[in-house]
Curated annotation (Swiss-Prot):
GO terms for biological process: cytolysis in another organism; monoatomic cation transport; pore complex assembly. The lineage of its organism: Eukaryota, Metazoa, Cnidaria, Anthozoa, Hexacorallia. Phosphocholine binds at residues 88, 121, 139, 141, 167, 171-172. This is DELTA-stichotoxin-Hmg2a. Belongs to the actinoporin family. Sea anemone subfamily. Composed of a long N-terminal alpha-helix and a core region rich in beta-sheet structures. Before the pore formation, the alpha-helix binds the lipid membrane, partitions into the lipid-water interface and stabilizes the monomeric molecule on the membrane. Finally, it traverses the bilayer, thus forming the transmembrane pore. Keywords: Cleavage on pair of basic residues, Cytolysis, Ion transport, Membrane, Nematocyst, Secreted, Signal, Target cell membrane, Target membrane, Toxin, Transmembrane, Transport. GO terms for cellular component: extracellular region; nematocyst; other organism cell membrane; pore complex. A motif (Cell attachment site, crucial for protein stability) lies at residues 177-179. It holds the Pfam family Anemone_cytotox. Residues 139-154 are annotated as: Trp-rich region, which is important for the binding to lipid membrane. It comes from Heteractis magnifica (Magnificent sea anemone).
Length: 211
């Protein structure tokens, strides 16, 4: 009997020393799981915002030139990824293959690894179920003494992959400066665009495509 009492006391002491996660700690763990590996995925379109894109930036680590991109599909149709073309820099993720209506794609880019003078400059393309191509361009330069952040969105007739020509068409066309302000325009084909890009070297680009 005495042995059982001693054993019970020992087990009780051991259990008392085991840390039980608090509610706050459990919430932090859930939040970490939700935010892990966001770039290259699809989320609910209504949930896209700066908070999500900040987490995408955080995934890229301590990189001086990087960008988190979110594009909300409210076009009424579905999109299929074609490709991404990087004029400068690179990415660690693949474009989400399929973006249904009312979903948003998350993507990211960064400068090349090492002490190299590159930014994150690219264009990517999605083939839309209406038979046309959605092109997105962003430019986060290395040297802000000569360049600024720029971005644009354009719809191309038919199917067209992203390449240097698509990038230059938007970059040298009439792009929007990354000025921390909202911009909108008519894309044609019954679609509209509204978006914003921040001005820093760790940039956020949020876009909404709608009817």
């Amino acid at each position: 009997m005495n042995r059982l009492i001693v054993l019970f006391l020992i087990v009780t002491m051991i259990c008392a020393t085991i840390a039980v996660p608090s509610r706050e700690e459990l919430e932090d763990q859930k939040e970490y799981k939700r935010s892990a590996a966001l770039a290259g995925t699809i989320i609910e379109g209504a949930s896209l915002g700066f908070q999500i894109l900040d987490k995408v930036l955080g995934e890229l680590g301590k990189v001086s030139r990087k960008i988190a991109v979110g594009v909300d599909n409210e076009s009424g149709g579905s999109w299929t990824a074609l490709n991404a073309y990087f004029r400068s820099g690179t990415t660690d993720v693949i474009l989400p293959e399929f973006v249904p209506n009312q979903k948003a794609l998350l993507y990211s880019g960064r400068k090349d690894t090492g002490p190299v003078a590159t930014g994150a400059v690219a264009a990517f393309a999605y083939y839309m179920s209406n038979g046309h191509t959605l092109g997105v361009m962003f430019s986060v330069p290395f040297d802000y003494n000569f360049y600024s952040n720029w971005w644009d969105v354009k719809v191309y007739s038919g199917k067209r992959r992203a390449d240097q020509g698509m990038y230059e068409d938007m970059y040298y066309g009439n792009p929007y400066r990354g000025d921390n302000g909202w911009h909108q325009k008519n894309l044609g084909y019954g679609l509209r665009m509204k978006g914003i890009m921040t001005s820093a070297g760790e940039a956020i680009l949020q876009i909404r495509i709608s009817r």
